[in-house]
UniProtKB/Swiss-Prot annotation:
Disulfide bonds: none annotated. Gene3D superfamilies: 3.30.1490.70, 5' to 3' exonuclease, C-terminal subdomain (1.10.150.20), 6.20.10.30, BRCT domain (3.40.50.10190), DNA ligase/mRNA capping enzyme (3.30.470.30), Helix hairpin bin (1.10.287.610), Nucleic acid-binding proteins (2.40.50.140). It comes from Thermus sp. (strain AK16D). One of its GO terms (biological process) is DNA replication. Zn(2+) binds at C409, C412, C425, C430. GO terms for molecular function: DNA binding; DNA ligase (NAD+) activity; metal ion binding. The active site is at K118. NAD(+) binds at D34, A35, E36, Y37, D38, S84, L85, E116, R139, E174, K291, K315. NCBIfam families: dnlj (TIGR00575), PRK07956.1 (NF005932). It holds the Pfam family DNA_ligase_aden. This is DNA ligase. PANTHER family: CHROMOSOME TRANSMISSION FIDELITY FACTOR 18, DNA LIGASE.
Length: 674
């Protein structure tokens, strides 16, 4: 073996061992046996002994033991200061910013700016030495932050190793939680009666500060990077636009929409366009960041004690409104959980009137100290769900009244039970629980029983014709024709719809049954993982945690439901009625046995491509490993591409993927839907 061949193999082995260390020590999800791991480590040691010039202090052979599993959050000093940004809230303030630049530089504008979306997350700093990640830390006070390296490494797009960079380098960015992950996490926490997060930014901060990195890994955090600290001069970069491209080329995720704009008026055009698109984004964006594009001008302008003189945050208008909490209603969900709902003086927020707002659970009410009659500040969490941000206690008059939880179910009168901070109606005959369960089961995204509306469900329950969803399949024509406004034709149509619903498949059935924390996406993932209801009923906690999108709280809640005798009896009766318990066969199983990972931007939405691959029998994962069959590479790929090359994983362009699908199915993949 030549020195060059040894160098390539040593680098490959180090990457492999680091990757498996990460799986074992951080995610607690090893992919190889201890014996296979030992074989890799032994081969690396032998090569380093045979070629001592290849030894390196960062080699896994030089590290004593493993990284600690618990994050420590020790204070760490940033090599160079992290500054804040001045804010602007109007075009006039952006013009004033440009005028300050003109005066400082002694020349007239307009100047060229790079404009980037301002992702609302938590600022972090990554520090590399000789291309190796030494630590990652939060911004803190700008001088000193908290080390969160272990938790940052659970974000798969953060590179551990770089090539073609200065010896000492700081990379700055934002860690954030996508809106979908935020809503899912809050649903889990609410179901458990735990404290929920007010917004995705708080959720990201709380998730990054988990002591157990495995918890962080399940929270779905993402990162985007946009700046360099130490090492910027050594790169020789001339513009912010080029800096973003430079970061992307080295495997860092960079928010894809950045652009250039000329002068304050050009910035305003971009701002207005992005403001309209704000709610279409998968993450919270609270404005745009405006930076002089020419880095030489940065050096001329410098910094104040707190902020750079060459950059500005142009904030989107706050969609927060003040209103009064008039009363609180208590609703009974299909699982019996009691949810307090605040009745508000109507207020207009983000295009719609808001008159009701969830107060989640007892923990939320206690933490907020909200009372009937209070003035409250309301917004839409994730741009979707109306929520109380805070109580305006300075406006209290003394006439406000505390919120008193009922002792009995507001629907059936049965005594409520308390599980932690969750109030629940245990009555299996509670009409509200039955109504909500049947309504959800029949809904379009569940079993899609057209014609079974709310009024008809109420009549069926009132007449004692159904008690639960399994009874729907025992209905006969003579049961229905005597109901008000239900003729013979309508009865026949409804019975046909009920019969057709038997064949919807496991995915729709799981969503329809309302397992805790299980929405459409999770129902699909469970169906793909287990394939049949019988296998799901036998699943354990670890089996559920292997399913994409399932965190520990959701896994335990699902498991409790699966083991519940009433639920198992319901499933038995549905099976006897002929309801399909198996996942629907995926078209031709054309890609069965193949595992795909996707990186970069595709011409179709990524989730759509993932769903298509799964429908064709493939497995889709988020991280590259030796088990990956193909890495699909779109525009502006991330660090997964480098890892795939290190592991020898084949890559496909989007077009090559579609050609593969066409070869396997004989159909144009663009005509196939997920």
């Amino acid at each position: 073996m030549t020195l060059e061949e040894a160098r390539r193999r040593v680098n490959e082995l180090r990457d492999l061992i680091r990757y498996h260390n990460y799986l074992y020590y951080v995610l607690d999800a090893p992919e190889i046996s201890d014996a296979e791991y030992d074989r890799l480590l032994r081969e690396l040691k032998e090569l380093e002994e045979r070629f001592p010039e290849l030894k390196s202090p960062d080699s896994p052979t030089e590290q004593v033991g493993a990284r600690p599993l618990e994050a420590t959050f020790r204070p760490v000093r940033h090599p160079t200061r992290m500054y804040s940004l001045d804010n602007a809230f109007s075009l006039d303030e952006v013009r004033a910013f440009e005028e300050r630049i003109e005066r400082a530089l002694g020349r007239k504008g307009p100047f060229l700016y790079t404009v980037e979306r301002k992702v609302d997350g938590l600022s972090v700093n990554l520090y590399y030495e000789e291309g190796i990640l030494v630590f990652g830390a939060t911004r803190g006070d700008g001088e000193t932050g908290e080390e969160v390296t272990q938790n940052l490494l659970t974000i798969p797009t953060i590179p551990r190793r770089l090539t073609g960079v200065p010896d000492r380098l700081e990379v700055r960015g934002e860690v954030y939680m996508p809106i979908e992950a935020f809503l899912r996490l809050n649903q889990e926490l609410e179901e458990a009666g735990e404290r929920i997060f007010k917004n995705p930014r708080n959720a990201a901060a709380g998730s990054l500060r988990q002591k157990d990195p495995r918890v962080t890994a399940r929270r779905g955090l993402r990162a985007t990077f946009y700046a360099l600290g130490l090492g910027l001069e050594e790169t020789g970069l001339k513009s912010q636009h080029d800096l973003l491209l430079w970061l992307r080329e080295r495997g860092f995720p960079v928010e894809h929409g950045f652009t250039r704009a000329l002068g304050a008026e050009g910035v305003e055009e971009v701002y207005q366009a992005w403001l309209k698109e704000r709610r279409k984004l998968p993450f919270e964006a609270d404005g745009v960041v405006v930076k002089l594009d020419d880095l030489a001008l940065w050096r001329e302008l410098g910094y104040t004690a707190r902020t750079p003189r060459f950059a500005l945050a142009y904030k989107f208008p706050a969609e927060e409104k003040e209103t009064r909490l008039l009363s609180v209603a208590f609703q009974v969900g299909r699982t019996g959980r009691i949810t307090p709902v605040g009745v508000l003086e109507p207020v207009f927020i983000e295009g719609s009137e808001v008159s009701r707002v969830t107060l989640h659970n007892e923990s939320f009410i206690e933490e907020l100290d909200v009372r009937i009659g209070d003035w409250v500040l309301v917004h839409k969490a994730g741009g979707v769900i109306p929520e109380v941000l805070r109580v305006l206690k300075e406006r209290r008059t003394g006439e406000e009244k505390p919120i008193i939880w009922p002792e009995n179910c507001p629907e059936c009168g049965h005594a409520l039970i308390k599980e932690g901070k969750v109030h629940r109606c245990p009555n299996p005959l509670c009409p509200a629980k039955r109504f909500e369960a049947i309504r959800h089961y029949a809904s379009r995204k569940a079993m899609d029983i057209q014609g079974l509306g709310e009024k008809l469900i109420e009549k069926l329950l009132e007449k004692g014709l159904v008690r639960d969803v399994a009874d729907l399949y025992r209905l006969k024509k003579e049961d229905l024709v005597n109901l008000e406004r239900m003729g013979e034709k309508s009865a026949e149509n409804l019975l046909r719809q009920i019969e057709e619903s038997k064949g919807r498949g496991l995915e729709r059935l799981l969503y329809a049954l309302g397992l805790p924390g299980v929405g459409e996406v999770l129902a699909r993932n469970l169906a793909l993982r287990f394939g049949h209801m019988d296998r799901l009923l036998e699943a354990g906690l670890e089996d559920l945690l292997e399913v994409e999108g399932v965190g520990e709280l959701t896994a335990r809640a699902i498991l409790n439901t699966l083991k519940d005798p009433e639920f198992r009896d319901l499933v038995r009766r549905l099976k006897e009625a002929g309801v399909e318990m198996e996942a629907k066969e995926r078209e031709g199983e054309a890609l069965k046995g193949l595992t795909f990972v996707i990186t970069g931007e595709l011409s179709r939405p990524r989730e759509e491509v993932k769903a298509l691959l799964r429908r064709l029998g493939a497995k889709v994962t988020d991280s590259v490993s030796r088990k990956t069959s193909f890495l699909v590479v779109g525009e502006n790929p991330g660090s997964k591409l480098e890892k795939a090359r290190a592991l020898g994983v084949p890559t496909l362009s989007e077009e090559e993927l579609y050609r593969l699908i066409e070869e396997r199915t004989g159909k144009d993949p663009r005509a196939l839907t997920a």
